[in-house]
Structure formats: structure tokens, C-alpha cells
């Protein structure tokens, strides 16, 4: 009787393990959601509207900023968000010719290449999200990054307006992302310095996955919630 009971327990454990294995195979990060679901905030944004640029040095309010390419970059400071109904940024062109959309996973930074991917972590609650930097700013004292309204919601600081964050530049993910949206960096140093447009046709490799969809796929790879 005891041996029969043990056998039943072992059978249940085996079924549970097999079920867990099948679930993990059925739902890898890139197929947990359909491309249609991941593209719902920008379904027609299948070609990247901006261009790759580093940019020249520039001055704002008497302070000089020096955009630069980098292989490693971390920064800690305060983040704010933009794209509210009254600030007028929604739909406007960004610093690299993209269109700002408050519902997408994007951000503005003073010196990082455009576009690039960064991981932003809210120090107050440890929530993180990976964003595409496609604009310049913020230029208020003690602010190191401006995130979109959607990103502020994910990081849970929309209501308070600002929060302390850590920024981590993701060089490898950036390179893969640029390939996925078919955006090439300028080949010559002169072109990179002058920030001229890439000669790429800028069409996403998968016509069913929007630009924001590609950003969400990187988040899912890192097991970060993107609320598709």
C-alpha cells in the first residue's frame, strides 16, 4: 500500500515536471505575444523614421554637451517624463528625425548616440524597462534622462513626476536592434562626426513587427514587463 502511494506521488511529480518543460518551450520570450499585440501602440510604424547620429557638441543655457559613441556607460541621477497632453511634445520630431510618441518605449538623453538602447531602473522600487533613446534632453538641473509617458507608467513614477534612476547603456542589444530595424551607422569617421543620415532604407526586417515591437522583444528577452 505504501509503495503504491509512493508510485502515485512519483507519477504526479513526473507529470508536473513535463508540464513545466512544455510550457517553457511553448512560450519563449519572442513568442509569448504575437507581433500584432506588441505593435498595437504603433501598428503602422514599420519603417524607422529617424537616422543614426552621434552629433556635434552643442550648448544649452551656457552649458556645453558633448555627444559621443561609447561601449560602456552607466549613470545615476533623476529622471523625469514628457509627453503629457499639455507639454506639446507628442507627435513632434526628435533630435534624430524620429517622431515622438508618448505611448512608445523611448527616452531623451543629452549625449548618448541616437538611437540606442538603455536599461532604466527606478531606484525607489527596482522596476526596470529597456528604452530606445531617440531625442536630446532633459535640460533641467539634476535631470539625467527624460522618458516617455508610457515608460513612466511602467517605472511607476508618472504621478510623482521625477524619480532617482540608474541608466545602463546596452551596446550589444543596440547593435542587434539597429540591424533589426535595418539602420546602419555611417561608415566613415567624418560622416559620424557630422551626423549625416545613414544610407539605409530603414525598413524593419520583419514587416509584421513595428519599431516599438522590436524594443518590447528586447524587454521580454530580459524578462521585463512591457504591458502589451
UniProtKB/Swiss-Prot annotation:
Signal sequence coordinates: 1-23
Keywords of this entry: Cell wall biogenesis/degradation, Lyase, Signal
GO molecular function, one term: lytic endotransglycosylase activity
SUPFAM superfamilies: Barwin-like endoglucanases (SSF50685)
BP GO annotations: cell wall organization; peptidoglycan metabolic process
Enzyme class: lyase
Entry's EC annotation: 4.2.2.-
NCBIfam families: rlpA
Family per record: Belongs to the RlpA family.
Protein purpose: Lytic transglycosylase with a strong preference for naked glycan strands that lack stem peptides.
Protein name: Endolytic peptidoglycan transglycosylase RlpA
Organism field: Rickettsia felis (strain ATCC VR-1525 / URRWXCal2)
Gene responsible for this protein: rlpA
Amino acid at each position: 500500500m505504501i509503495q503504491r502511494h509512493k508510485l502515485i506521488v512519483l507519477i504526479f511529480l513526473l507529470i508536473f515536471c513535463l508540464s513545466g518543460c512544455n510550457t517553457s518551450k511553448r512560450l519563449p520570450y519572442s513568442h509569448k505575444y504575437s507581433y500584432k499585440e506588441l505593435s498595437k501602440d504603433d501598428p503602422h510604424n514599420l519603417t524607422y523614421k529617424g537616422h543614426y547620429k552621434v552629433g556635434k557638441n552643442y550648448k544649452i543655457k551656457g552649458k556645453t554637451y558633448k555627444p559621443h559613441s561609447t561601449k560602456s556607460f552607466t549613470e545615476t541621477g533623476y529622471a523625469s517624463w514628457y509627453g503629457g497632453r499639455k507639454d506639446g511634445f507628442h507627435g513632434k520630431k526628435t533630435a534624430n528625425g524620429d517622431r515622438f510618441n508618448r505611448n512608445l518605449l523611448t527616452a531623451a538623453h543629452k549625449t548618448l548616440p541616437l538611437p540606442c538602447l538603455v536599461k532604466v531602473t527606478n531606484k525607489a522600487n527596482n522596476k526596470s524597462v529597456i528604452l530606445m533613446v531617440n531625442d536630446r534632453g532633459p535640460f533641467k538641473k539634476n535631470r539625467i534622462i527624460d522618458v516617455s509617458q508610457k515608460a513612466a507608467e511602467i517605472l511607476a513614477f508618472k504621478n510623482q513626476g521625477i524619480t532617482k534612476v540608474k541608466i545602463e547603456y546596452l551596446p550589444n542589444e543596440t547593435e542587434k536592434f539597429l540591424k533589426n530595424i535595418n539602420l546602419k551607422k555611417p561608415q566613415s569617421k567624418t560622416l559620424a562626426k557630422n551626423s549625416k543620415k545613414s544610407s539605409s532604407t530603414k525598413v524593419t526586417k520583419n514587416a509584421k513587427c513595428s519599431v516599438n515591437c522590436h524594443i518590447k522583444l528586447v524587454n521580454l528577452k530580459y524578462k521585463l514587463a512591457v504591458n502589451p
